Amino acid sequence: MSRIYQKISNAGFNQAFINKLLPEWWDERLAETPSGKQYASLHLARIFSLAPESLKDESGAASFCFNGNHRFKHRINVGEEDLTVATAVAYSAARIAANNFGIDYDPDVNLEWAAVRGRLLKESPYVTLPALVRLCHMSGIPVVYIKNFPAKSCKMAGMALMCSGRPVIVLTQAKKHGFMLFDLAHELGHIARGHLKASDDGVFVDRKIDSDATADLEGEANSYAFGLLSGKEALRIVPETGKYLRADLLARAAKRFGEENAVDPTHVVLNYGFTQNQWPAAMSALKILCSEMPIDQDIVRTMLMEDIDQDCINDDDLELLTALCGA
């Protein structure tokens, strides 16, 4: 088994991460027989999105096995290979979610931002993270938050992909409140704008989600996100007084603006922080607004698990998904 582990480790998965994802029943003695070793290789390949044949003793280095096309956007000097390991992890989680989701995908659902916003505002004063996750799920689009990645691996900010005939959205945002809402709207924008239709199993990986981007597909996804969250495809929050606001005043103003304009106050605060470069005040205002609210990661994780078909999913997949999501 040590040779297989070494190949997986050389591909970018540290041993502690490998151990975290092994199923409860795992036994090192599997490798003592040819059939057991073959089974172990197949199981490990499935966990880490690797080609099974590349884990054989006679093969060279382990190779990744993804379906569809990849479109990586990244900073200067950050190559596509920088995201390969994280993409493998995301594929594993997305595959499990797609194959075991309890709600059928509706390919005819209207995902134009005005239509989505209109539907959500019938039940809520503004577009919230739980409401948007629920709409995605009811359309048959699982939203997966991944917490755990291999040590030292570079993770993407978000990912939209076709998997097993349905779109899946993967999010990795670690900040507790507010940020994940725009990330989700942005990734839904890639789906709604048809950015995954380059192939039957298209993939769109966001190395970084920059709300200020205006060019090409990133600009389209941002315009969609702003439209969905605010009713305008571009939004810049500025103080009426022309002066920067203290955190308590910002929280109060964001709540008032949100109620008057049907915009989530957390999005108002973050928009203000970004456009005015006032991050300390914005982060403190978020704490005030969200002091008694569950964190975004728990919301997304809980809602996913609630909509997984527990009668369909096998124990190994449930254990793996739980380990990746950090549940």
Segments predicted by a language model, with ranges:
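Active-site hotspot residues in diverse enzymes, especially metal/ion-binding acidic/histidine motifs
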Residues: 1-327
